[in-house]
Amino acid sequence: MALDLASLLGKKNPPLVGLDISTSDVKIVELSKSGDNTYRLERCASEPLPKGAVVDGNIENIEQVSEAIRKVIKKSGSNVKNVALAMPASSVITKKIILPADLSEQALEVQVESEANQYIPFAMDEVSLDFCVIGPAANSVEDVEVMLAASRKEKIEDRVAVVEASGLQAKIMDIESYAARASISRLIEQQQNAGRDQIYALFQIGSKVTYISILLNGDVVYERDQQFGGNQLTQDIVRNYGLSFEEAEAKKRQGDLPDS
């Protein structure tokens, strides 16, 4: 369920910073909107996480992660307190469903929850459920296509807890892959002919997994994840230069490797 960045950063909404919590570090980004409907990077920073603080997208040590967030906020110089963050795709169940277009908002919510029971292998009181109407259904003018998303409450609460422990407020919870697509969509819109009929590839390279999405005219036509990432490069540096993992990671980030 992609974030509408224009809505998030509009005048009617409070300022937000984007916060990414990964296995290896936390990152923060603050944007501002220009008059020509483009965005400018105001501040950004990253702070490494202790090993084991986040494992497979799950927060294992709230204090270590919240301390890293406090450090990255200070490093960035941002004074914005409202945060947009996201859940790993692996922690979220998503499903597109078709529903009648003439349902009221309340009836739509009831119908979505009823449909969700078929796809979610947990009790409904254990999950947080959200949905958005994508648009008219492809094969019926009387129906709409709806995207529903659900995640275990405990996983969401852990991310909210580290944000609040850092003195911030979580305002938006998205899905990492959808947020990334929303961002690249903004860039595509600035290309010739708004990128129409052009193929774009989005690579999200994490410490252990690389996610690949191929987009055409706003639709994802192919996506896959590969079990390799930045940690493999760091391990190669360790072997080639005889450094510790921490030293190799620092030099990789700084571009401070010897010529030979």
What are these language model-derived features?
Residues 1-260:
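Hydrophobic/aromatic-enriched cytosolic interaction surfaces used to assemble or bind macromolecules
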